[in-house]
């Protein structure tokens, strides 16, 4: 780990971390990322695995999606996370890509950031001067941008052990694709993907539910305070429609769980 931190400090913005490569390599192919130096952190043992810390489940940032998907511990204590991981790409991607890479990429259309936001996850970043914890609500700051500094490594993700009713809904044009829109429900929290530059909480939906609105009424507010784009996958208006539909479906599914 220290060698990785030293390399980041030496090369700064010219360097990129490489673990699974699921997010970085496609960007490099399209020249959207052109690092001069790649720092391979896939072999750092302390960045992989699932452990407990107090009332949290701790997942190392270099843990493969497939490990999160199939881990008996994750399935028992955080089924939303295990299920979301099962929808990331195809089996090849899940066996190579990492949870930390998906999060650090900062793509609002990715699956895991949306569910982690709904769970109020905590992200631990390490630099040469120590570690700091970043709340999910503060971690995603812009289009493909996170709160990580160029000299920091995301080392783990902490999710609460408290069991909540949950759901993850995802609409795609093609199977195993990025989400056109996604919705995660965890307890009283609702998060949306691909409805803004970053994953966002559907605060108006949450407030309506707390005030006694029924699910159908609350879900109509899902697209409030969002800024979906129009692209080859969907128009902004269709994304707004999807947000309302997926949120209602997710709330109903979560309510039906024991």
Label each region the model flagged.
Residues 1-258:
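C-terminal structural segment of proteins
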């Amino acid at each position: 780990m220290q060698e990785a931190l030293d390399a980041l400090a030496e090369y700064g913005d010219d360097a990129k971390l490489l673990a699974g490569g699921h997010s970085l390599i496609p960007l490099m192919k399209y020249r959207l990322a052109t690092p001069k130096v790649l720092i391979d952190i896939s072999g750092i043992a302390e960045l992989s695995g699932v452990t407990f810390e107090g009332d949290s489940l701790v997942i190392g940032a270099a843990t493969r999606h497939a490990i999160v998907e199939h881990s008996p511990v994750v399935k028992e204590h955080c089924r939303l996370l295990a299920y979301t991981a099962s929808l990331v790409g195809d089996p090849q991607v899940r066996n190579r890509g990492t949870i930390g890479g998906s999060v650090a990429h900062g793509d609002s259309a990715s699956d895991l950031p949306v569910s982690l936001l709904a769970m109020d996850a905590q992200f631990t970043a390490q630099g040469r001067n120590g570690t700091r914890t970043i709340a999910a609500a503060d971690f995603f700051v812009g289009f493909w941008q996170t709160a990580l500094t160029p000299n920091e490594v995301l080392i783990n993700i902490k999710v609460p052990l408290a069991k909540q009713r949950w759901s993850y809904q995802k609409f795609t044009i093609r199977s195993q694709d990025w989400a056109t829109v996604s919705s995660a429900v965890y307890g009283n929290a609702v998060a949306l993907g691909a409805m803004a530059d970053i994953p966002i909480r559907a605060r108006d939906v949450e407030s309506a539910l707390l005030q006694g609105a029924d699910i159908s009424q609350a879900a109509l507010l899902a697209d409030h305070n969002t800024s979906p784009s129009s692209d080859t996958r969907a128009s902004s208006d269709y994304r707004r429609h999807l947000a309302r539909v997926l949120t209602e479906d997710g709330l109903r599914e979560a309510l039906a769980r024991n």
